[in-house]
Amino acid sequence: MAPSIVFILLSTLLRVTSGYVLPNEEGFISGVISDKGLDYAKDLLIEKGIASIVLLQLPEIENSAQVPFVGNAKVVLSNITIKDIQVNSSSLRTGENGFVLVVSGATANLSMRWRYSLSSWLIPIGISDSGTASVKVKGMQVGLTVNLRNQEGTLNLTLLDYGCYVGDLSIKLDGGASWLYQLLVDAFEGNIASAVEEAISEKIREGITKLDNLLHSLPKQISLDKTAALNVSFVGNPVLSNSSIAIAINGLLTARNEALVPQSYQKGLKISSACGGLPKMIKISIHENVFKSASLVYYNAGKMQLIIDELPDQNILNTAEWRFIVPQLYKRYPNDDMQLNISVSSPPFIQVTYQDVGATIFVDITIDVLEDGEVIPVACISMEISASFAVEIIGNNIAGRLRLQKFSTYLKWSKIGKLHMRLIQSLMSSVLKTVILPYLNFKLMRGLPLPIIDGFSFQNANILYIHPWIAVCSDVSFLGDYYLSQQSPYLS
């Protein structure tokens, strides 16, 4: 078989089971595959497993048998090829010991070539012949049990038990005599059955070994850009129930190339499996601390600042436009160009509520006058911005858009005397709505990658707000075999 599909799904689509305690208190992104998701994974696994077996050629079989009144016949079966497999029933069960996949009542069709040579004292001249035959395999059962455990942030996959059993087979000759058919049935039935069983069992071993190697190659950290990296190391062991599989990753952002040291955040203990009554394959939950860690990393790196020297209304960036609002500014710097140096003064405060994501952002806007090539700071206005963040799923990323709720301004310092803040507030409102929020939304719409493997995509995703978690309830669709060639399935 080719079991990689299901177990890649199990190891990368994360956690959400009702009342589950997180596998480890440091897991801030978590999720589960529901029974619907497991059925999808099982069917996809079987489909891909069959594809890997069809056209598989089995080893040549040679045997001899005594034909009554004729003599000894040497028969060789070659080009034994599995043409197709049909599955009648299957099941994927989870339990404390791991995953159990069972396929029962399967049938398979084989093609082969035969040749024989016959000699005896009655027939001094040897007789030989050749032809083709088809084989129908019935009552085939395939099963495997695997265990998935966490070791230092990496998942280890262990094959505990596996096997294939062939119940019955029938052979149809193209050419040959009736005695040869009976000879094939009597002498070769066990050989053909064993060859099928061993070939499928070997495919299972190969698949588990390749998948285990793939799991070991998964990165523990993914660089998002030149500033930040996402900690995707697994925490705790997978939690298996009779209808779902739960796994968690650390999920926090760190400065790029920074050692993966847990940050001090208050831990969430439980999350709900509810998807608002929607039967979805997976549910991925993201703790608000993921967003807080992103806020802290980009703030500490000095990335939350912007210099504005162009505006839709360019007149705002000239002291002449301010002559009635701040006369002393125009008096001291008549008709000089200006720029606005905008910087976030502290890491934005982010909190998931039961309706949306709330954000409080403290911004300092320093007014600079450009005179004779010199940048002259003349005043600083602080703004407290309250906004809501509407989460969206764009491709396989979680992104969103800020919506302004309210804002307030006050004068932080001034070199040009007292300012009339009521008059200035309208100008700041224009800057906020035309520059600051569009700029932030441009950055936010890039989003953060959700842990799903290449080749799969979210389908009909719904967003739920369950303080302090954001939950993505979604089905998934399989787009192709791109993932097979990737060493780093998280990357898109």
Model-inferred region functions:
Residues A2-S111, T158, Y165-S492:
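Extended, low-charge, aliphatic-rich alpha-helical segments
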Residues G153-L157:
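Electropositive, elongated alpha-helical scaffolds characteristic of BAR/F-BAR
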Residues Q141-G143, M281:
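Extended, solvent-exposed, non-transmembrane regions
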